[in-house]
Amino acid sequence: MRTSSRRLHRFNPGHEAAVGIGQANYTPDAASRRMADDLETLPLWYADSGDSVWITHTEGADQFLDSLPLFLRPDVRLLAADALCRLSADVEGPLLATPWGLSPDVLAAFERLRRRGAPILVPTWSDALRTLTHRQTAARCLERVLRRLPELPPVAVPRFCASVGEVVDYVTTCQAPFMLKTPFSCSGRGILTLENTSITDPERRWIEGALRRWGVVSIEPKLDKTADFALEFHSDGHGCVTYAGLSVFDTHPRGAFTGARLGDPDRLRGQLPDILRGPLFDRLRTAVTDTLCDTVGRIYSGFLGVDMLVYRRPDGSAAVHPFIELNLRYTMGLVAVELSRRVVHPDAIGRLLIARCPAPGDALRAHQADSRRLPTHFADGRLRAGCLSLVPVTPASLFRAFIEVV
């Protein structure tokens, strides 16, 4: 991945909620904290040569690195806070703080580390970044992309409601089912599906709780989805947004990411539905790129992803929703793009998988079973077949991140 200087990465999933709260002392929910803990070494696989990753569990991380074949081992350092504070700025030069997603709390953590002596440059938080992270920005981008692609069938732009009454008005005048979303959420979180035009008591309580916390919720028709995909980009912060790759991924019914396909970019594009195998794909990529240049290009610097989907229309024909979600952060799709480029053999097809196990010990047993079932085989310095873990798996782990190539 392109960078202008060496970086210090930090994996902080679920940062959207932290952006919404806007407090430097924000504490993520338990699931986000556990995911950040178990998958803290994931930046190894998208960081540039010479970068570093700020981690907590150095012993397990060192053992994990030692377990990788030398030809596959990233030229990236895994450093705990004390080791970072011992680095010399004169020798090392400053490292640019680069979290998975920018938010006030993670930047405050980097700043505390800098004050302890770590030679790092910490970006300044801007309220403009909060505005861009709000789902209203994605809604505005959707409108602009639709204007640039008049050949697409119209899709409903999300409506933002500030009261239960406004939600009721929407559902009683439109056709069910519906998707309700909180303004700072992603990957299936903060989403409620309304299957009918009448709102149940539990659904009303969910809406009331979301409104108390966030002030608004968005609502839109739920589409008959047949495929998920995303386009990944990089913004230089000076008005230039460039295409970084295609992600074809899978989700739980509620929308949470479960896995992304890996392989040669042309072969991945060939896995898209027929509607995207012609000129529409390139027109879509151009329209979204131009929209992002206008919207985020001079405010945000870094990688980002735009989630999209293919859906079935009432007449049975396929159509594209060109802008479901804007992710101003590194994404699992970007991780998949880099794994396809760096790790997976060009003749192989695989999947990046994120799995959550119910209890400590389950993840380690699953990892051991997968390693026996799919032993790794390498060719030309790349993974040709097998199951490769991307993070250490310990008896305490709940989350796993791994590649399967079969």
State each model region's role.
Residues 345-406:
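Peripheral (often C-terminal) accessory segments that flank ATP-dependent C-N-forming ligase machineries
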Residues 157-158, 177-203, 230, 253-271:
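Glycine-rich phosphate-binding loop of ATP-grasp-fold ATP-dependent ligases
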Residues 171-193, 215-225, 325:
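ATP-grasp fold ATP-binding core
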Residues 252, 323-337:
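Glycine-rich phosphate/pyrophosphate-binding beta-alpha loops
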Residues 203-258, 309-312, 316-323:
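Phosphate-binding site of ATP-dependent enzymes
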Residues 2-52:
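N-terminal-proximal low-complexity accessory segments that begin disordered
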Residues 32-42, 54-169:
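Conserved N-proximal alpha/beta basic substrate-recognition cap immediately N-terminal to
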Residues 214, 243, 255-318, 356-383:
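A long amphipathic alpha-helix within ATP-dependent nucleotide-binding catalytic cores
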